Amino acid sequence: MSFTSIFIALLYLGGFLIILVTASAVILPLLITSLFFATGVVLCGFLSNKSYKLALRAYNLATPHTRSSLQAAADHLAPLDSVETVSPKEELLHKIHHFYKKSDSNVRTPIVVSGSEIPKSVIKVSEGT
């Protein structure tokens, strides 16, 4: 090997080492910072999962007690016979009827039949009605 080739090889090796040290000086702090934040994310995820499971367990333990308390309170209330309750289906039909009644006065009121009102015999309906 000649002196010139050894010198050029050492020059390339020196340049490589300088670039390596410079890149390491820039990348290593960023890599350490990234590792720190990634550890924080994993730790927060773990704590979030544990707190969720703890809250879910507390909820599951409290739900039967709450239901029994509400049922006991409801048992002490007198039934309201004078108030007519409207099912959501009937309320929706009522709203639809009033919506169409504003635009067209020929729309008929919907007929709502509950299960107890259905007759056991067949009713014949004529077309002229």
Swiss-Prot record:
Matching Pfam families: Osw5 (PF17062)
Alphabetical list of InterPro entries matching this protein: Osw5 (IPR031430)
Cellular component GO terms, alphabetical: membrane
Protein name as it appears in the record: Outer spore wall protein 5
Membrane topology: Multi-pass membrane protein
Family, per entry: Belongs to the OSW5 family.
Species whose genome carries this gene: Lachancea thermotolerans (strain ATCC 56472 / CBS 6340 / NRRL Y-8284)
Cellular localisation: Membrane
Membrane side Extracellular: residue ranges: 22-24
TM region(s), chain numbering: 2-21, 25-47
Keywords per UniProt: Membrane, Sporulation, Transmembrane, Transmembrane helix
Cytoplasmic compartment residues: 1, 48-129
Organism classification: Eukaryota, Fungi, Dikarya, Ascomycota, Saccharomycotina
